Amino acid sequence: MTAAVSPARLVLARARTHRPLLAAALLTVLLTTAILATLTAYSTTIGDASLRHALAHPGDPADTTLTLKAEVPADRRAAADTAVREGARAAFDGLPVTLRTLTRSGPYALPGALRPPDRRARGDEPDLTHLAALDPTQIRVTAGRLPARTAGPEIEAALPERAARALGLAPGDRLTLTDRLDGPPAHLRVTGVYRPADPAAPYWRLDELGGRGIVELHFTTYGPLLADPAVFTGDRISTGPSGWLATADFSTVTTDRTDALREAARRGAAALPKADALGGTATATTELPAVLDRVERSLLVSRSTLLIITLQLTLLAGCALLLVARLLSTERAGETRLLLARGASRAQVARLAALEALLLAVPAAACAPLLAGPLTRLLAGQGALARIGLRLDASVASVAGQGTVWLVSAGVALGCALAVTVPALTSSFTAGRAGPLPGAV
């Protein structure tokens, strides 16, 4: 190798000479790198999508929520709301949080005249009820209208559909409730009838009647009677427990955030009841850590399956690449011996082989992450994933923005370059002078 000929020009000249083999090698390297980059992107993307789907559609919708109940006086409810909102945001590791509340009164006795003949309480025990301020998004008015704020002693209220039917009450009726805690009676006027928008919604976990309208235990309890939130700010009715339901927006959660989210949920559920604004009477519950554990185990199984497929493809691609590399080195053996005969050192030959390998590796490393997005979408559009409607964020920008995909592409491309380089080096370094003839010439 003379100084007059630069290594780059020599590499290009050799490439033109062996175009078919180099094209086969380039195609093999590109396919290997693109497929492994796609499997990496697919594993990450399907993991993130599966996690979000599992959190958004759990077996029990209440499992991914944070529920808190506490006895809070009327003058401390605003501070309690702030404390719960901040605590819920911390419990969900900073994710956007939606907070719904249920504020209720103490227990009241219904007038004896309203007892249905088939639902009479034993002895002199009255049927019970209570008032509550409910989240308006969780109810549907079926008759009349929602209660409004009133200035006088009379309180407007709406009854659950089932309770109104059992008690024989309708919009326009009036009744007086007796406070079971020796407080003043509550004078009500029925303005409407409602039912839960979704009786299975987690929100109704805050209601001791579970949104059913009637519960028969030792007492028969009807309710809750829906009242305007302003009713609970004064002393017109007795004070009962308050409930909060916090739900998070999991649309941006990724699998690398699972551990932090699990730990935050555990800490948050333990820390919230100790907040000063809640008076030390609160209880907080969430099943989010258990849900994350189940999802993580499922993801480990799916990733193990992908790992097996990846190893099989790697072995197949490696064999094909070594075969092409051996053919290429065989074709170039004469050129390599000629370079050595003209005074080129083994280091120069090795550098030349490395430059030739980089011609294959660099395009593959650059193109594989860009091809991974469309290939991932192609995989996701087939089979069970397409049938269940699992949506993957597999755009070119999203996949190309994953550092892991670029690292895998670079690593695989360099590995392929090494696989192409080694046969050329070993064949040239082991080639030497022919052995002596067996006899005299």
Regions found by a protein language model. Name each.
Residues 353-370, 406-413:
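Selective transmembrane-helix segments that form parts of the transport pathway or gating/packing helices
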Residues 167-169, 321, 330-333, 341, ...:
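Short, glycine/acidic-rich beta->alpha junctions
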Residues 298-325, 351-352, 356, 401-408:
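Membrane-entry segments of alpha-helical transmembrane domains in multi-pass membrane proteins
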Residues 1-24, 45-50, 54-60, 330-348, ...:
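Feature of multi-pass inner-membrane transport and sensor proteins
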Residues 172, 343, 368:
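Conserved G/P- and acidic residue-centered "switch" motifs that form tight phosphate/ATP-binding loops
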